[in-house]
From Swiss-Prot:
Domain NACHT stretches: 293-618
CARD domain: residues covered: 26-122, 126-218
Principal location listed in the UniProt entry: membrane
Upper lineage: Eukaryota, Metazoa, Chordata, Craniata, Vertebrata
Organism: Pan troglodytes (Chimpanzee)
The protein's name: Nucleotide-binding oligomerization domain-containing protein 2
Residue ranges of the TM segments: none
Task performed by this protein: Pattern recognition receptor (PRR) that detects bacterial peptidoglycan fragments and other danger signals and plays an important role in gastrointestinal immunity. Specifically activated by muramyl dipeptide (MDP), a fragment of bacterial peptidoglycan found in every bacterial peptidoglycan type. NOD2 specifically recognizes and binds 6-O-phospho-MDP, the phosphorylated form of MDP, which is generated by NAGK. 6-O-phospho-MDP-binding triggers oligomerization that facilitates the binding and subsequent activation of the proximal adapter receptor-interacting RIPK2.
Segments for region (Required for CARD9 binding): 241-274
BP GO annotations: adaptive immune response; autophagy; cellular response to lipopolysaccharide; cellular response to muramyl dipeptide; defense response to bacterium; host-mediated regulation of intestinal microbiota composition; innate immune response; intestinal stem cell homeostasis
């Protein structure tokens, strides 16, 4: 049934106190009041853990509210706690008001007992009815037995009251001490051999528990040590290069953190996800699985996932947040996978995180007893070489098993159930299997524009430096686009002198940026008198052996899914102390205690960069092998290849240690990053640099030709896999993330000829790239290719991270877009105004979908200008933004001069009556608009009157959506008058508008004179069941 947790958090205690302090807790609690508070009661019963729920059952059983048969019905293994809580409420409600009152009292007793346990009454140890007394004093007996079940079982077995099998069943490691005590009492209830009398007598002799274990000195000492340990690990932010140590408090900058929304769920349109604070990680509603314990944070490489966890650890250790957890255990997945020996939960927590100096048994039991006060964090799940599976079940917290089985069962809740777990990962590593066990999923999207600026100001407090850097970024959109990932912002900060002094162009591609940081490190490792200006061939050639050693190590690590390197592995790769001193290898974070300090690359992207460098320049790499990198005939994708024996770097002479084998075994998302870097290194831009370092220019030319051929072939294969269009329809394709990386590789190579060739093969009418982690850098790559399309395309980029900077990157391809969908992309007025400024000159662009962004009245003038100037524009969807009456009035001016618009979406804004009036006046004589949505805009009867006048005049509008307003009967009566004179409207949606039978009657009278209208939606209004039946019979066009 899982581990218990007798304590609840401060927030939960407060909520419970508020609920129990209301009328439900008094003697006058009625069944109606009980039912009205059902959702709050369910939340209360499941807010702590299974221990709190079972404590409530103890009290109800002792008061005979529940019969023995009722009680047994709540002990079905594997049932979610929320299901059990609802079943308990149903059972109690059916028993009447007295039972409802008793459940409230039981919840009060259980809450009080969790905070300050006390002995409730006493009993006669020589009772004539021992089984009945065991039941009536059950809560106190469970508390007495808590730490003495083992001894009591041994004694009962010696006396012959229980069998060895029964002892083993009660001792199963999945049960906590309290659960074992309850199962012993349950056994005594059904056995008629004297066990009940034996327990009643001997439990009386046990010592009374004086205090919660949480208050014990041993526990407090361990908690203090754990806080100190976590604080020491998280107080300072080691920069990627390890060259400087910054106080995390001084440098930490909030990232854009959003909760993942299931767009497939039914219900009203959702607003764009709000940017959350870290402190909301465990309190956000909208759970994927209410019974799961694991919180997932996904983000691209370099988006700041590790730093976010470090911030969480620091806030907890400093006592500033997350204080509902008494124990926080941080782990790194790249460190965990290095553990070859089997280990248990106890070994993991104590030997690989924080060792208790005294009382190890008591402290571990405490963790098992109170899992809801425990938080475990696992950073970098994408770097864990074992793929998640739920096939191997492991439920014992003391029995050792493999590290992957241990981790997977922790995430599923088979171990330390009710303990919170936080996992960070790149999106590609999260499978559908894992998502089944996720409570809440968050997207970490990197820095906002304000975040980039704030970070640079925190890094550079010298007068003027930050201002100059920010101006440089704002003037260089490609570089600005890269910086939304914190790792690039760090690079810009690190190389600020080089960037500000550069006379040529600023870095444009990812490869440019990494070569700049390489130059920075090489210059700082070179004596001042011999250092040249910039990354010249002589500088690179002088350290080429070092770079190749690092590249060989990086490539081997990718092939082996190894990201932390021991001294032996460094030696086998011929990495010398001089190579290490260059600064790209740093001491691994979260080093396993007792081991020698291993090293790791500054960041996973640096490991990929050096692997690409090795592939570009090493004489050991035949050019033909590059096909494995660009997905051209990769046998390593087959299941058989994945089962090949793992190799070791020491056996480099073996067949499996070849470059091909390494590329076949590497994780796909790491190969994609490496491929993009290799394409950039082999570009014409960097040809001269590499040619000076290559003994054979012919070999470099062959590599370059091979990379071009592989890229072109992979794109051709991707395009040929697109199924043909249905007759009469445009060809549509939903591109996958792999396609994005091929486009990014093409962009890194910066060859217009290849881009034009790729565009010729993309013969589609609708290109869909939703949920593909498209940020500003990907937008630049897409525009680089799509601008060469011969036919216009509808480009759909919903649910990505485009932002204002990404919009700017898309402008070069706007001329070939016939429609652009940018739903849920954190775009503000600034980005849209730039987009529209360009769209004024793009005759192909006829549709814009911008709902679920951050648009306000500030963009209304640009929108109005677009409508007034572009007389072939067809659709403008602005739903779920922040536009008010003022913005609607400005937009109405543009509508008056427009003769082409067919679809106008305004749902979920704040236009109110004044905005509705302005739009209605502009649309009265409009000759093309067919669909208008003003759902959820706070429109009342005044706005409805204006819309009714519009309906009386308009002869084109076919659908009007007015749900979720407050039109009421007065507004509906006005609309009914307008319908009497209208001859075009086919669908009128009026759901959820506080309409009564009076308003419906007015609509029926209008429908008698209107044969055009096909549907009137009236769901969610204030009709009785009789009125619904009556109205439906009178006219079937009323949808009730």
């Amino acid at each position: 049934m899982g581990e218990e947790g007798g304590s609840v958090s401060h927030d939960e205690e407060e909520r419970a106190s508020v609920l129990l302090g209301h009328s439900l807790g008094c003697e006058m609690c009625s069944q109606e009041a009980f039912q009205a508070q059902r959702s709050q009661l369910v939340e209360l019963l499941v807010s702590g853990s299974l221990e709190g729920f079972e404590s409530v059952l103890d009290w109800l059983l002792s008061w005979e509210v529940l019969s023995w048969e009722d009680y047994e019905g709540f002990h079905l293994l594997g049932q979610p706690l929320s299901h059990l809580a609802r079943r308990l409420l149903d059972t109690v409600w059916n028993k009447g008001t007295w039972a409802c009152q008793k459940l409230i009292a039981a919840a009060q007793e259980a809450q009080a007992d969790s905070q300050s346990p006390k002995l409730h009454g006493c009993w006669d140890p020589h009772s004539l009815h021992p089984a009945r007394d065991l039941q009536s004093h059950r809560p106190a007996i469970v508390r007495r037995l808590h730490n003495h079940v083992e001894n009591m079982l041994d004694l009962a077995w010696e006396r012959g009251f229980v069998s060895q099998y029964e002892c083993d069943e009660i001792r199963l490691p999945i049960f906590t001490p309290s659960q074992r005590a309850r199962r012993l009492l349950d056994l005594a209830t059904v056995k008629a051999n004297g066990l009940a009398a034996f327990l009643l007598q001997h439990v009386q002799e046990l010592p009374v528990p004086l205090a919660l274990p949480l208050e014990a000195a041993t526990c407090k000492k361990y908690m203090a040590k754990l806080r100190t340990t976590v604080s020491a690990q998280s107080r300072f932010l080691s920069t990627y290069d390890g060259a400087e140590t910054l106080c995390l408090e001084d440098i930490y900058t909030e990232n854009v953190l959003e909760v993942w929304a299931d767009v497939g769920m039914a219900g009203p349109p959702q607003k764009s996800p709000a940017t959350l604070g870290l402190e909301e990680l465990f309190s956000t509603p909208g759970h994927l699985n209410d019974d799961a314990d694991t919180v997932l944070v996904v983000g691209e490489a370099g988006s700041g996932k590790s730093t976010l966890l470090q911030r969480l650890h620091l806030l907890w250790a400093a006592g500033r947040d997350f204080q509902e957890f008494l124990f926080v255990f941080p782990f790194s997945c790249r460190q965990l996978q290095c553990m070859a020996k089997p280990l248990s939960v106890r070994t993991l927590l104590f030997e690989h995180c924080c060792w208790p100096d005294v009382g190890q048994e008591d402290i571990f039991q405490l963790l098992l007893d109170h899992p809801d006060r425990v938080l475990l964090t696992f950073d970098g799940f994408d770097e864990f070489k074992f793929r998640f599976t739920d096939r191997e079940r492991h439920c014992s917290p003391t029995d050792p098993t493999s590290v992957q089985t241990l981790l997977f069962n922790l995430l599923q809740g088979n171990l330390l159930k009710n303990a919170r777990k936080v996992v960070t990962s790149r999106p590609a590593a999260v499978s559908a299997f894992l998502r089944k066990y996720i409570r809440t999923e968050f997207n970490l999207k990197g820095f906002s524009e304000q975040g980039i600026e704030l970070y640079l100001r925190k890094r550079h407090r010298e007068p003027g430096v930050a201002d100059r850097l920010i101006r440089l970024l704002q003037a260089t959109s490609a570089l600005h686009g890269l910086c939304h990932l914190p790792v690039f912002s760090w690079m810009v900060s690190k190389c600020h002198q080089e960037l500000l002094l550069q006379e040529g162009g600023s870095p444009k591609t990812t490869t440019d940026m990494y070569l700049l940081i390489l130059q920075h490190f090489l210059l700082h490792a070179t004596p001042p008198d011999s250092a040249s200006q910039g990354l010249g061939p002589s500088l690179l050639r002088g350290r080429l052996p070092t770079l190749l050693h690092l590249g060989r190590l990086a490539l081997w690590g990718l092939g082996m899914c190894c990201y932390v390197f021991s001294a032996q592995q460094l030696q086998a790769a011929q990495v010398s102390p001089d190579d290490i001193s260059l600064g790209f290898l740093v001491r691994a974070k979260g080093v396993v205690p007792g081991s020698t300090a291993p090293l790791e690359f500054l960041h996973i992207t640096f490991q990929c960069f050096f692997a690409a460098f090795y592939l570009a320049l090493s004489a050991d790499v035949p050019p033909a092998l590059l096909r494995h990198l660009f997905n051209c005939g990769r046998p390593g994708n087959s299941p058989m290849a994945r089962l090949l024996p793992t190799m070791c770097i020491q056996g480099s002479e073996g067949k499996d240690s070849s470059v091909a084998a390494l590329l076949q075994k590497a994780e796909p998302h790491n190969l994609q990053i490496t491929a993009a870097f290799l394409a950039g290194l082999l570009s014409r831009e960097h040809w001269g640099l590499l040619a000076e370092c290559q003994t054979s220019e012919k070999a470099l030319l062959r590599r370059q030709a091979c990379a071009r051929w592989c890229l072109a072939r992979s794109l051709r294969k991707h395009f040929h896999s697109i199924p043909p269009a249905a007759p009469g329809e445009a060809k549509s394709v939903h591109a996958m993330p792999g396609f994005i990386w091929l486009i990014r590789s093409l962009y890194e190579m910066q060859e217009e000829r290849l881009a034009r060739k790729a565009a010729r093969g993309l013969n589609v009418g609708h290109l869909k790239l939703t949920f593909c982690s498209v940020g500003p850098a990907e937008c630049a790559a897409l525009a680089f290719v799509l601008q060469h399309l011969r036919r216009p395309v509808a480009l759909q980029l919903d649910y990505n991270s485009v932002g204002d900077i990404g919009v700017e990157q898309l402008l070069p391809c706007l001329g070939v877009c016939k429609a652009l969908y940018l739903r849920d992309n954190n775009i503000s007025d600034r980005g849209i105004c730039k987009l529209i400024e360009c769209a004024l000159h793009c005759e192909q662009l006829q549709k814009l979908a911008l709902f679920n962004n951050k648009l306000t009245d500030g963009c209304a003038h640009s929108m109005a200008k677009l409508l007034a100037c572009r007389q072939n524009f067809l659709a403008l969807r602005l739903g779920n933004n922040y536009i008010t009456a003022a913005g609607a009035q400005v937009l109405a001016q543009g509508l008056r001069g427009n003769t082409s618009l067919q679809f106008l979406g305004f749902w979920g804004n704040r236009v109110g009556d004044e905005g509705a009036q302005a739009l209605a006046e502009a649309l009265g004589d409009h000759q093309s608009l067919r669909w208008l949505s003003l759902v959820g805009n706070n429109i009342g009867s005044v706005g409805a009157q204006a819309l009714a006048l519009m309906l009386a005049k308009n002869v084109m509008l076919e659908e009007l959506c007015l749900e979720e307003n407050h039109l009421q009967d007065e507004g509906v009566c006005s609309l009914a008058e307008g319908l009497k004179k209208n001859s075009s409207l086919k669908i009128l949606k009026l759901s959820n508008n506080c309409i009564t039978y009076l308003g419906a009657e007015a609509l029926l009278q209008a429908l008698e004179r209107n044969d055009t209208i096909l549907e009137v939606w009236l769901r969610g209004n204030t009709f009785s069941l009789e009125e619904v039946d009556k109205l439906g019979c009178r006219d079937t066009r009323l949808l009730l």
